[in-house]
Amino acid sequence: NVSAYELLFRSSLDDVFSCSDSDYASLALLVNSFIAIGIDRLSSGKPVHVNFTQRLLQDGVPSLFPPEVVVVEVLETTMPDPAVLNALARLKEQGFTIALDDYVGQQHLEPFLKLVDIVKVDFSLASSAHRAMIPRSGVKQDAVFLAEKVATRDEFQAAVRHGYRLFQGNFLSHPEIKRGSDIPPDALASLHLL
């Protein structure tokens, strides 16, 4: 069963991220998904995980979207400074689900663990011992663990054994690239101004 989708920016039909401006990539993804393509067409009514940069979190950009539709993903490169932690607390008050992306036990991300609802553990980076240990780490009681980049049946079965409840990766499904029309420059500029 699909519980949610993850929306990722791609500037070409190759399944790789190739944009040097992460703020632009996130904003372009949001405009394409909600305006050019249509979020219902992409998600069939399921929530969508969207990566938000530190700057976009601080600027409150996730608040422009419905909390029942968008799961706010905090990137592993985001520093847990007071402005970001306050922004995440406000988003939670508004009803957003918060996910921590690509967690493999990085100490600098620990302040997020008390806030997030979903901890996404990157199975391509974490050792098998680390994968087993992370769900027992200092995370809030009701946090859900998502095993991402699960590539084999063995990884999937190990994730189930270790208490992961959500799963993502090529073992389960391959990403699909959906193409929208070109984004009108004024639409992207308007979103950025908001």
What are these regions (language model features)?
Residues 1-71, 76-79, 83:
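Bacterial c-di-GMP phosphodiesterase EAL domain
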Residues 91-105:
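Sensor-1/coupling segment of RecA-like P-loop NTPase cores
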Residues 84-95, 132-141:
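Surface-exposed amphipathic alpha-helices with a cationic face
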